[in-house]
């Protein structure tokens, strides 16, 4: 069993800090390490300046470890609370419903992991072998990896700065033994944080298919999605498309639809038309989605006749078409 206990890091750090890095630390692998404005007066300045620069020697190892994964997809959102992890969960269930597909779900939200709970395997732990870390299998063809499996209990908090989170992300990408997968879904934190920069850097040589972006219809969510799209374009990440979650509520009794989050500026579809990206579809609200995520059950199996189930399957067909897997 691999575990983080008492808030300690299980991995040897990439470097030894004299004190926690400052808020705007450029990172030890940056060309500006030890030279940036935030480095002045930092006790770690000399340590960072002395570190080797240039290509990360672990990138070829990450590429080799992920070589047997056919499709690698990042799941992104500009704002928290739009249902990104929920959608990742439903996407995992839907793809793995095809017994001919091998699916993996990697939870890289280090400080707020939720996939283990939503997939019904929160009490599991990671085991090591001579081939690396063995992922937790939800079903015979659905595997998952998360920091939650390394914590002593579900209430344990991860209070890490960037370097520790980045080291674990690299460990997940380099040392988890996925074997062969048709799909690896990578659930990321909301926003454009340190983790996103690291994920992009670590996967540069691994030929990811791109990113699926999740939003809700209201402008306050779309404002942050614009930033996410801008980040992807600057980072060279292919945008596979956008999904509008919680687009409406269909009453299970009268079948009438209500707009809970109103698309005051046209919603996700209008944004896609404006910015020239593919709109993969809208998924309506269904309270039973939350119930299934609480119990770790597949919403698509439990409620196949729900309008949300139909919409999710249509989105997945569009996604498979976008990655050339039809």
From Swiss-Prot:
Name of the encoding gene: NBP35
GO molecular function, one term: ATP binding
Biological process (GO), any one: iron-sulfur cluster assembly
Stored Gene3D superfamilies: P-loop containing nucleotide triphosphate hydrolases (3.40.50.300)
Xref: PROSITE patterns: MRP
UniProt subunit comment: Heterotetramer of 2 NBP35 and 2 CFD1 chains.
Region ranges (Disordered): 1-38
Record key words, sorted: 4Fe-4S, ATP-binding, Cytoplasm, Iron, Iron-sulfur, Metal-binding, Nucleotide-binding, Nucleus
Organism lineage string: Eukaryota, Fungi, Dikarya, Ascomycota, Saccharomycotina
Its biological purpose: Component of the cytosolic iron-sulfur (Fe/S) protein assembly (CIA) machinery. Required for maturation of extramitochondrial Fe-S proteins. The NBP35-CFD1 heterotetramer forms a Fe-S scaffold complex, mediating the de novo assembly of an Fe-S cluster and its transfer to target apoproteins. Required for biogenesis and export of both ribosomal subunits, which may reflect a role in assembly of the Fe/S clusters in RLI1, a protein which performs rRNA processing and ribosome export.
Residues involved in [4Fe-4S] cluster 2 binding: 251, 254
Amino acids binding ATP: 78-85
Protein name: Cytosolic Fe-S cluster assembly factor NBP35
Cellular compartments per GO CC: cytosol; nucleus
Cofactor stoichiometry and binding remark: Binds 4 [4Fe-4S] clusters per heterotetramer. Contains two stable clusters in the N-termini of NBP35 and two labile, bridging clusters between subunits of the NBP35-CFD1 heterotetramer.
Annotated CDD domains: Mrp_NBP35
Cofactor: [4Fe-4S] cluster
